[in-house]
Amino acid sequence: MIRKPIIYALMVIGVVLGSGWLLREEPTAETPVPARPATTQTGAAQVSYSDQDWKDKLTPQQYQVTRKKGTERAFTGEYWDLKDKGTYHCVCCDVPLFESDHKYESGTGWPSFYDVAQGGNVGTEIDRGWFMIRTEVVCNKCDAHLGHVFEDGPDPTGLRYCINSAALDFKSPSEK
């Protein structure tokens, strides 16, 4: 007789998940986009390594986040609370992505920026995973997953680039 409650529970879960899929929002012209053009720098070569080369180059967490589109736990990343001046580079290919002048405290536990660095190294793609539609943030040079961008950020852009620390390498002005 235990089968009936289990079957009922599975049916309820199926209805809930199915309803969420049917009620999802389709991307519109108002889907968030970077404040600057999301194109690779002129003359910048695309970086492409084998999966094994990425595993050899990156830590396990960096690999999981950047190559497998993972997410680190909130309030655990190296840079979520860093207030130093400098530039955040892609941990995979070292191009500049975000400036500390554009970083702000969003309360989310991840580094958050309201704008991207100049150079066109940050791009976006539609992410349809986990029964929702979000805008994924990627490195235009090596296609690394960086995080997601949302439309709940501060002025002047109204955007919140929510980025995984594991996808970043911070460089102070003296290290550039």
What do these predicted regions represent?
Residues 46, 55-61, 65-89, 95-176:
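A short Gly-Trp-Pro
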Residues 1-58, 149-176:
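Secretory/periplasmic and organellar redox-cofactor proteins
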